[in-house]
């Protein structure tokens, strides 16, 4: 039996100020799935994501990644297994060169020498950025920096790739290039986004989180075609966009 990449069971969480962000979330993501996490601002999406690699803990319920519980004793391995790509790549890139940024995670985990170099080269090749290895990240375009940010996570060979608004601030060509890269990866993907057409393009399954609970879970095309569901959870497609017209 194949172990799920992610299992969230009865997850509830309140912040120290008393704000209850999650109310008993249950979610299973199978290995290799690409799932869009949708919902309005304040729905609890960020709170859920921060539980996946143990940045937030102490609530009710449980989270397991490939069968390993997210717990203090396992945090080093959990953070290798769950790679988060932030919305702003400049929050993730801080070394003098692209190569050093991509090497940072594996090196911090103890990898050295030819093994480390091979890991860096592989990650950069997967995102089409190998030729920029010796460039300073701040000399790259925004789209290129986002691809390098993805490479920094891929260098850790994660079980799950979590992407926060991956299409934001990308021009059409960069958006297409990133989509092609994400489709090529043999990794479980959880994509947090307000870009509903991008979710439809990349993720066969979508989950709507609203007011701290899972409000809907199913094929992305079906959910986005349900006008009543979309209105109820403050989700809107671009003017004139018909999800049923998209050939998947």
Q: Where would I find each of the regions flagged by the language model?
A:
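Helix-to-loop junction immediately C-terminal to a conserved catalytic motif
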Residues: 53
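Conserved ABC ATPase signature
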Residues: 136-140, 144
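Conserved ABC ATPase "signature" region
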Residues: 114-132
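Conserved ABC transporter NBD signature motif
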Residues: 61-69, 78
């Amino acid at each position: 039996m194949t172990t799920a990449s992610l299992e969230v069971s009865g997850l509830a969480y309140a912040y120290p100020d008393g704000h209850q962000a999650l109310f008993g979330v249950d979610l299973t993501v199978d290995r290799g799935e690409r799932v869009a996490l949708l919902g309005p601002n304040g729905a609890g999406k960020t709170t859920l994501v921060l539980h996946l690699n143990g940045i937030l803990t102490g609530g009710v319920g449980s989270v397991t990644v490939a069968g390993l519980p997210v717990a203090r004793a396992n945090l080093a391995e959990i953070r290798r297994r769950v790679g988060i790509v932030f919305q702003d790549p400049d929050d993730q890139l801080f070394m003098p060169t692209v190569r050093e940024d991509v090497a940072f995670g594996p090196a911090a985990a103890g990898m050295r020498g030819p093994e480390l170099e091979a890991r860096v080269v592989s990650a950069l090749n997967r995102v089409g950025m190998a030729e920029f290895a010796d460039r300073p990240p701040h000399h790259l375009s925004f789209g290129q920096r986002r691809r390098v940010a993805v490479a920094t996570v891929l260098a850790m060979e994660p079980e799950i790739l979590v992407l926060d608004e991956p299409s934001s601030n990308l021009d059409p060509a960069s958006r297409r290039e990133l989509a092609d890269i994400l489709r090529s990866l043999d990794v479980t993907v959880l994509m947090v986004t307000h870009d509903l057409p991008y979710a439809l393009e990349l993720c066969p399954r979508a989950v709507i989180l609203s007011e701290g609970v899972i409000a809907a879970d199913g094929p992305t095309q079906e959910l986005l075609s349900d006008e009543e569901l979309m209105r109820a959870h403050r989700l809107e497609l671009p003017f004139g966009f018909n999800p049923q017209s998209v050939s998947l």
